[in-house]
Regions:
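N-terminal secretory targeting modules
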Residues: 1-89, 142
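Serine-esterase "nucleophile elbow" of acetyl-processing enzymes
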Residues: 70-140
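Structural motif
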Residues: 87-88, 147-149
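Loop/turn elements at helix/coil->beta-strand transitions in domains of secreted/extracellular proteins
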Residues: 117, 144-148
């Protein structure tokens, strides 16, 4: 178990208030949303791949049953945060977030199912370890954390 109190993490910048997610095209997300595409998993990229590989079984599966990115009110690919029940925090990049994957196929979802508890996916695609630390520092006092995975 690690202590995530303010004295234990030396970070370059502190998050004072969590801001809504701003995606790469400049749009700002507010409230819970379900997206068919996420910046690194674009419709254009899918069409190009499907045109070049029309018999690819994975692409055919995704064409019949498209991936949806269900985001909570903070822009995380996670249900709304239930702060009363203990849960597992998952930090990381697009692999943890699940770009190009059904939620149930992500490593974070599988580990959470195995260990039990609420699912707090704080993954941030395209970001680094310092972003993960800032997010952990901000959310550590707001969530009932059972385990932290990175």
């Amino acid at each position: 178990m690690i202590n995530v109190g303010k004295k234990d993490l030396c970070l370059p910048r502190e998050i004072k208030e969590y801001q809504p997610l701003q995606i790469s095209n400049g749009d700002v997300m507010t409230g819970k949303q379900t997206l068919d595409w996420y910046p690194m998993d674009s419709e254009q990229r899918f069409r190009e791949n499907f045109t070049n590989h029309p018999t690819n079984k994975s692409l055919l599966t995704y064409k019949k049953n498209p991936i949806q990115y269900k985001l909570n009110e903070y822009g995380f690919r996670s249900d709304s945060f239930d702060t009363e029940k203990p849960g597992n925090v998952f930090l990381g990049c697009s692999h943890t977030f699940g770009i190009g994957n059904y939620m149930e196929n992500t490593w974070s979802h599988k580990v959470n199912k195995k260990v039990g508890g609420k699912f707090f996916n704080l993954a941030s695609p395209g970001k680094g370890i310092m972003t993960s630390l800032r997010l952990l520092r901000y959310w550590s006092s707001k969530l009932n954390i059972k385990n932290i995975f990175h």
